Amino acid sequence: MKVYLENTLESKESGEWFTIPINLKAVEHILGKGSYVVANTELPFFLENGHYDLEELNRVCEKVESFSDFFPQEDIIEIQKKWFVSIFDLLDHVNELEYWPNCTSILEVAERIIESGDLPGDLKKHLNLNRYAEDLEAKRDFLITETSVFERRK
């Protein structure tokens, strides 16, 4: 993860790419003391260009890296676009997300729910899986990515 920082107090345009976690002393050494703005990013989430507390940005990126235990980083932008106004908003509500790994449809989610339930096997074969999947899709909030399905529960 990298960000391109510029010093807004410098009269000449000066900027540099920094790898997260950002070393604040290195930023000051390279760009000089001042006020820094994020002018470009290479991040697995969307971040508007602008002023950010660099220590907070380090913490956000650390949390995002920890998501890899929970869901793929490559899906973060899609999740963010669907449900959240910013990465900060996503972090505040990450516990509302359910990740259905290796599912590529609501039908597969329905199968998982039924398989993980306490229904007797002979009853499971009589369920209309397509109808159950349609009901899930109508009543719940899902996002289907290339590799997974996510659900937001409020």
Q: PLM features: residue spans?
A:
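Extracytoplasmic/secretory-pathway segments with low complexity and glycosylation-like composition
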Residues: 80-117, 122, 153
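Acidic, proline/glycine-rich low-complexity IDRs
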Residues: 6, 111-154
